[in-house]
Amino acid sequence: MHQFTTWTGTTVPLMNDNIDTDQLLPKQFLKLIDKKGFGKYLLYAWRYLDDNYTDNPDFILNQPEYQGASILISGDNFGAGSSREHAAWALADYGFKVIIAGSFGDIHYNNDLNNGILPIIQPKEVRDQLAQLGPDQEITVDLADQLIRTPFGECPFDIEQDWKHKLLNGLDDIGITLQYQDLIAEYEDNRPSYWQN
């Protein structure tokens, strides 16, 4: 996993409530197993007019001024539904580094974190202000200080300290385990003989 300390980027508002994982990444794309390439299918039914990938010009992610936005502002209950990790893969592959919503589906929240995306919960009034920013206005998310720095001020956010440690140090579950490699080896060496090969 890549280290996440601060991120500065532009925002795109998609303020719908209850955007579920099936909307984020429809089931027909779940047979793919490589984490790369899913960005093309993110919000497929909303982004495209047909199966030939004709852009829906009215959909915000297809509007030129929002190309390259890396911070998604959304409504309540983002990522509800099934536990498909592919939805987080699609968000990451599209280029989103931060999702700011009113709440998250529990499993999707963890899937985002496991894939290096920082999910942040903010009240509606903050999200509404963020949604009013122009497409060229940047905000900075500072994980160490747990602050969102915006043109209208700073907004604090909460994150579990274990997740914060993992993101700041670029560690996934395997990376955490490897930090204890010497202790694991010592334990294995000191096991009773009947537990050893």
Curated annotation (Swiss-Prot):
InterPro entries, per the entry: 3-IsopropMal_deHydase_ssu, Aconitase/3IPM_dehydase_swvl, AconitaseA/IPMdHydase_ssu_swvl, IPMI_Swivel, LeuD
Major enzyme class: lyase
UniProtKB keywords: Amino-acid biosynthesis, Branched-chain amino acid biosynthesis, Leucine biosynthesis, Lyase
GO molecular function: 3-isopropylmalate dehydratase activity
Keyword Lyase appears in the UniProt entry: yes
Record-linked Gene3D superfamilies: Aconitase, domain 4 (3.20.19.10)
Gene Ontology CC annotation, any one: 3-isopropylmalate dehydratase complex
Presence of the UniProt keyword Lyase in the record: yes
Pathway of action: Amino-acid biosynthesis; L-leucine biosynthesis; L-leucine from 3-methyl-2-oxobutanoate: step 2/4
Catalytic activities: (2R,3S)-3-isopropylmalate = (2S)-2-isopropylmalate
GO-annotated biological processes: L-leucine biosynthetic process
EC id: 4.2.1.33
Function: Catalyzes the isomerization between 2-isopropylmalate and 3-isopropylmalate, via the formation of 2-isopropylmaleate.
Oligomeric form and interacting partners: Heterodimer of LeuC and LeuD.
NCBIfam families, per database record: leuD, PRK01641.1
Annotated family: Belongs to the LeuD family. LeuD type 1 subfamily.
Name recorded for this polypeptide: 3-isopropylmalate dehydratase small subunit
Organism per entry: Streptococcus suis (strain 05ZYH33)
